[in-house]
């Protein structure tokens, strides 16, 4: 059965992560999210307080990114950023893994990094960004297995700032690895309705995109950055 606009909107994290995002742009992001009933807005942690105020009593969550976009910070710093973002009003956290540690064969350190943020989140859902464009398929599977074992809420393809974005093949691989329990978030390059529906068909249950309005109104979102 085809997804309704309302159902499709509830898969979307309406996203603005540009370093120069202004208060006015964050307010407009929130206005659009409330109008179209998106699941959340996804913003940098410094913008969480403003977004939380704008979205109070709308039912739209605020999602904050942590260790973004490189994932190369200390685990304690990532955990602290998650803690203060949640205190400021974030209802979900998207963290970036330590990609360098993974490439160096330090899988235990990667898992410990994820676990530190997961513990800091408590009951707040955590999405773990793999940055799939930088990983081999074996590395993608390894991180997805870690996330499954730790019981995080979602695995996520990309930051949208690195090499490449979400691909159907990566979404399908991630879904096969984590099974039906974890969510899979496709982010980076999902800019129109056809791409969104294809990602969902491949196994995505959440979409990170700055083209949410174009997707639910079936317009061209190619001018969007994320």
From Swiss-Prot:
Pathway: Carbohydrate degradation; 2-deoxy-D-ribose 1-phosphate degradation; D-glyceraldehyde 3-phosphate and acetaldehyde from 2-deoxy-alpha-D-ribose 1-phosphate: step 2/2. GO terms for cellular component: cytoplasm. Catalyzes a reversible aldol reaction between acetaldehyde and D-glyceraldehyde 3-phosphate to generate 2-deoxy-D-ribose 5-phosphate. HAMAP family: DeoC_type1. InterPro entries: Aldolase_TIM, DeoC, DeoC/FbaB/LacD_aldolase, DeoC_typeI. It is found in: Cytoplasm. It comes from Burkholderia lata (strain ATCC 17760 / DSM 23089 / LMG 22485 / NCIMB 9086 / R18194 / 383). The active site is at residues 94, 156, 185. Keywords: Cytoplasm, Lyase, Schiff base. The keyword Lyase applies. Its main location: cytoplasm. The keyword Protease does not apply. GO terms for biological process: 2-deoxyribose 1-phosphate catabolic process; carbohydrate catabolic process; deoxyribonucleotide catabolic process. This is Deoxyribose-phosphate aldolase. It holds the Pfam family DeoC. Its EC number is 4.1.2.4. One of its GO terms (molecular function) is deoxyribose-phosphate aldolase activity. It catalyses: 2-deoxy-D-ribose 5-phosphate = D-glyceraldehyde 3-phosphate + acetaldehyde. Belongs to the DeoC/FbaB aldolase family. DeoC type 1 subfamily.
